[in-house]
UniProtKB/Swiss-Prot annotation:
Keyword terms, alphabetized: Eye lens protein, Repeat
Family: Belongs to the beta/gamma-crystallin family.
Residue ranges occupied by any Beta/gamma crystallin 'Greek key' domain in the UniProt entry: 24-63, 64-108, 114-155, 156-198
Keyword Chaperone part of the UniProt annotation: no
InterPro entries, A to Z: Beta/Gamma-Crystallin (IPR050252), Beta/gamma_crystallin (IPR001064), G_crystallin-like (IPR011024)
Taxonomic source organism: Gallus gallus (Chicken)
Gene: CRYBB3
Protein name: Beta-crystallin B3
Stretches the record annotates as C-terminal arm: 200-211
Domain of life: Eukaryota
N-terminal arm: annotated segments: 1-23
Protein task: Crystallins are the dominant structural components of the vertebrate eye lens.
SUPFAM superfamilies for the chain: gamma-Crystallin-like (SSF49695)
């Protein structure tokens, strides 16, 4: 059954610049495949309903990256939105737990360099893995366990995943310290793959080491 769509109705908000001077632009659509009412954003939106959208059915990121959230006020499951088209909810959700995306904000990239420390236990104790300017699709394959209970993001912005191959729930780590897994809203200290969130102009190959 084909649903008849009317031409998109457009709204624009924001000034087009992030806090660090970078440009951010994203278009959210109420229906799948870039149909229905739409809204162009260049700044955070705590509730898509404020822009007269009942939901988000598809997304086009012109410049970013952005971070989407399952619930209003930047709560719930997180979804990293990098430059490109997302025609359906399952194109931005790696866990496929929920088709809801109700708030979003620009994701700041503080540096072209990336360094992160993963710790086995809370409080930065136990085994440690350092990753520098690299993506790791499987912590197990590189000699580390799947238990990550605290994190130090020293440079750059990272996203950790519940399962290998960048699958499952996503958890974003902006530069800072995360003493306990509840500080990144995880239900348990489980992380099996990690990658950088990068500006498209940066393509560096890096390294990792365990201790």
């Amino acid at each position: 059954m084909t649903e008849q769509q009317s031409p998109p109705e457009q709204m624009v908000t924001g000034e087009g610049a992030g806090e660090r001077g970078g440009n951010y632009k994203i278009t959210i659509y109420e229906l799948e495949n870039f149909q229905g009412r739409r809204c162009e954003l260049s700044e955070e939106l705590p509730n898509v309903v404020d822009k007269a959208l009942e939901k988000v059915g598809s997304i086009q990121v012109e410049s970013g990256p952005w971070l989407g959230f399952e619930r209003q006020a930047f709560a719930g499951e997180q979804f990293v939105l990098e430059k490109g088209d997302y025609p359906r909810w399952d194109s931005w959700s790696n866990s496929h737990n929920s088709d809801s995306l109700m708030s979003l904000r620009p994701l700041q990239i503080d540096s072209p360099d990336h360094k992160i420390h993963l710790f086995e236990n809370a409080g930065y104790t136990g085994r440690k893995m350092e990753i520098v300017d690299d993506d790791v699709p499987s912590l197990w394959a590189h000699g580390f366990q799947d238990r990550v209970a605290s994190v130090r993001a020293l440079n750059g912005t990272w996203v950790g995943y519940e399962y290998p191959g960048y699958r499952g729930r996503q958890h974003v780590f902006e530069k800072g310290e995360y003493r306990h897994w509840n500080e990144w809203d995880a239900n348990q200290p489980l992380m099996q793959s990690v990658r950088r969130v990068r500006d498209q102009q940066w393509h560096q190959r890096g390294s990792f080491e365990n201790s």
